[in-house]
């Protein structure tokens, strides 16, 4: 039996290049309930890598792909923190939305 969950995770890394913020929200009631928040700061070398992508250079596509993979790992860290801190399992999450 598949149970429809009302738990969602939102992730965002903004233009400030400082890190990723995440939220676990329960939409089961009339008013959404923020169940947990978590964030992770970017390492200084990752910030330098992202900043360098704003200028023309060698291997831009390769460097952008490496940055995307590193960003995905930070997203995963924040999701893990949200789940661990709330006692919610990954199977209980209906969807994850990410922007950044």
Identify the function of each model-found stretch.
Residues 1-100:
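Short acidic/glycine-rich loops and adjacent helix/strand connectors
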